[in-house]
Amino acid sequence: MSRCAFVTLVNSPDYVIGAQALKHSLDRTVSAYPLICMVPPNSCDPAPLEAAGCKIKEVYTPRFSDEFIRRHKRDSLHRRAPFDKGSKPAFHDPLNNFCKLALWQLTQFDKLVFLDADTLVLRNIDHLMNYPEFCAAPNLYEDLDGFHRMNSGLFTAVPSEATYQKMLEQLDRPGVFWRRTDQTFLQSFFPRWHGLPYIYNALQYLYLNLPQLWQWDSIHVIHYQYEKPWQKQHSKVEKLKPLIDLWWAVYEGRDIAVDLDELARA
């Protein structure tokens, strides 16, 4: 399994700190695999990522038609499909999400596990490298209907240039609109996706909306969807304080074992 890796996308300076925390969390759980940071040209300074021990891979945004760009740029997408459950930070650019597809071009690897740069690994997940393509956890954060949809914050992939080219053929077609960008597209491209337990991609709003499912002693990955833990101010800072404090402890390299035990008993 040496030709395996975790991979994330860092497409703006604001996600550099997220990817650093993600790498720290993988190191803390004694992962055997590297973290590859896909970085589009001129999108951020990769030096802090390299200093954290990440491997850098330059990737490029797919070439989109003008019509596709107009439909999916931030203002247009938010008018047509507003985020009414939480707030996306100002640095979020929906078009950048499609850079995630470039991981299928990393054919020097046999298997990749993608993690969004706003995720944190609490327990070792190296075993996911043995899982087939395409595995993902449900988009579970508000009600049980989320079990019917996947969330693209974590998934397994088998790199293939042929797969990437098929994706490009289906991605930018006349009139197509991917409501949640890469997430909606990937569910369409992999309609028979394999469902992982939600504990492999526990969305932070699950902590607020379905607390009976938030079991600290079993969660493997936290996904800080919507507001980010490194944002200085947002409307849910107090409600999400235990999750935010945990993220900062990992980012700053503090021991979180005791904190996790205390949270599990709470």
Please tell me what each predicted stretch does.
Residues R3, K100-L101, P132, N151-S152, ...:
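Short, surface-exposed beta-edge/turn micro-motifs
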Residues M1-L22, V30-S31, C37-P40, E50-A52, ...:
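A glycosyltransferase accessory/donor-loop signature
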Residues S31-A32, Q108:
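Short loop/turn motifs at secondary-structure junctions
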Residues D45-A51, D126-Y131, K232-H234:
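Short loop/helix-cap segments at secondary-structure boundaries that form the rim of catalytic
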Residues S12-P13, K88-D93, V113-L115, R173-G175:
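Short, flexible loop segments at the rims of nucleotide/cofactor-binding pockets, characterized by
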Residues A47-T107:
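Active-site-proximal specificity loops/subdomain of glycosyltransferases
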